[in-house]
Design a protein with these regions (language model features):
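Alpha-helical solenoid scaffolds in large eukaryotic transport, assembly, and signaling factors
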Residues: 24-59, 63-76
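Residue-level detector of extended alpha-helical repeat arrays and alpha-solenoid scaffolds
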Residues: 21-24, 39, 53-58, 97, ...
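Charged, low-complexity interaction regions
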Residues: 18-23, 92, 152
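Core register positions within helices of long alpha-helical scaffolds
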Residues: 30-33, 59-67, 100-106, 132-135, ...
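Long amphipathic alpha-helical scaffold regions
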Residues: 51-68, 127-159, 185-193
Length: 193
């Protein structure tokens, strides 16, 4: 039977929370198979905390991410990642965007690094973007390229110094040494740590 993405999402959400593991896996498999469109659709249902409850939608997105990070279902991962990235860009609520970033960090790849790095200067999302970049394998080249840019803010230097430490990136040492000259106390502390 041919069901639309809208129908699959509505049917899946109606079954949550799942009664047991079998139902959970079936629902998550169906939702994950809707790909980017389904993920974006569910993410669009998230509302600011003062406007309603997001538990079912967060449960669904978290479940889909967990489902596609299982090696048995990895073929569905790319479309889910793309949906999360698009949802982050479209979402207007910072807390919900932070939640979406927290999910992205479980399934992101190095191909997503530039999209995540765009948020490093966002006052609310910088920490979430940074954690996603740090937890994503293969982002070292992008982080080094970011460090080589002119006119980096102190906040950006602190974020990059943290990322370099977390990734144990020895190639970043020349940047860190250069940044120490004239660094404010917070930046110097992050570089030394």
């Amino acid at each position: 039977r041919q069901r639309t993405t809208e129908t699959i999402v509505a049917d899946g959400l109606a079954q949550l929370p799942a009664a047991d593991a079998k139902v959970f896996n079936q629902v998550m498999g169906e939702l994950a198979a809707t790909g980017s469109k389904g993920v974006e659709m569910i993410a669009a249902m998230l509302v600011p905390a003062d406007k309603g409850k997001n538990a079912t939608f967060e449960y669904a997105l978290n479940g889909v991410v967990a489902y596609v990070t299982d090696p048995a279902h990895e073929a569905l991962r790319d479309d889910v990642r793309k949906g999360l990235l698009a949802a982050i860009d479209r979402c207007g609520d910072d807390a919900n965007r932070a939640f979406l970033f927290s999910q992205l960090q479980f399934c992101s790849t190095a191909a997503d690094a530039a999209a995540m790095a765009r948020y490093l200067d966002d006052p609310y999302l910088a920490g979430y973007a940074l954690r996603a970049l740090v937890s994503t394998p293969g982002t070292e080249a992008l982080l080094l390229a970011e460090a080589g840019k002119d006119d980096l803010t102190a906040a950006r230097k602190q974020a990059l110094a943290y990322a370099f430490a977390e990734k144990r990136l020895a190639a970043a040492e020349p940047f860190l040494l250069t940044w120490l000259e004239g660094a404010d106390a917070q930046t110097a502390e992050q570089i030394y740590n």
